Regions:
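Sec-dependent bacterial lipoprotein signal peptides
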Residues: 1-19
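Short loop/turn and low-complexity linker motifs enriched in small/turn-promoting residues
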Residues: 17-122, 129-165
């Protein structure tokens, strides 16, 4: 009986695991454009993360996960890890995330936090450079994609509640 319960628990846990995929479909052979996530240090214990989570439904390895993995066991200190993705030169649906990420989860219980996530349309242009940008403040948590050279947004903004309590 115990082994059956253990097996059922393991199967349930593993079923929830999802693999990560590249931003471009496996069969895509055309040109791509780079879109960089941003992980901005606010203090030794806090970073603000602006990232792409999914492209056309494909789950990406994200900067928040990379930062979490790189900082496991470091206690009250966090070092940012920002990733970038090569997207095909074609219209896409991006799932964007803006979040506060503390060095330890317990810090989030007693400090201001925010997380907002949503989907936007994005049509990259050849020869341009892009980054995921955003704003985390007491009044608003927002994320969008912008062209690096001009600093101009190229997608709509996803907005949510800020860090104010």
């Amino acid at each position: 009986m115990k082994s059956s319960l253990c097996l059922a628990a393991c199967v349930t846990l593993l079923a929830g695991c999802a693999s990560f995929e590249p931003a471009a479909p496996a069969d895509y052979q055309g040109p791509t454009v780079n879109v960089a996530d941003q992980v901005l240090p606010v203090s030794d214990q806090l970073v603000h993360v602006f990232e792409i989570r999914r492209v056309d439904g494909r789950r990406l390895l994200s900067s928040s996960i990379a930062t979490l993995n790189a900082n496991q066991g470091r206690g009250f200190s966090v070092t940012p890890v920002a990733l970038s993705n090569e997207l095909p030169l074609q219209p896409a649906r991006l799932q964007l995330l803006a979040t506060t990420q503390w060095a330890m989860p317990t810090l989030a219980l007693t400090h201001p936090t925010c997380q907002t996530e949503g989907e936007v349309s994005f049509t990259p242009l050849d020869g341009r450079h892009y980054r995921v940008a955003g704003r985390i403040a007491p009044d608003e948590c927002a994320v969008w994609v912008e062209e690096i050279e001009s600093g101009q947004p190229v997608t709509s903004k996803v907005t949510g509640k800020g860090t104010g309590r």
